[in-house]
Amino acid sequence: MINYLKGKILFSNSEYISVVVNNVGYKVEIVAGRIYNKGDEIDIYIFTHVREDSFRLFGFDSQNELNLFEKLLSVSGVGPKSALALL
């Protein structure tokens, strides 16, 4: 699983960023309201969410933020989208 990425931001909007690492682009869903600029170098902690029909990456600025996200996921009825919105 992907746990951490270090690369350059290729694209950014309010829902996700594209991070290029060794010429491979990763779409990473982010906390709403975060501002990232194209061309900036980024270190981002990743939660990898795998299901039968999808493979999604969620990105966080710190290990503590990632840990909080994982704790929110342990609450019954809270999925990745809800947990991300709560942050």
Describe these PLM feature segments.
Residues 2-6, 10-87:
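Long, highly charged, low-complexity intrinsically disordered interaction regions
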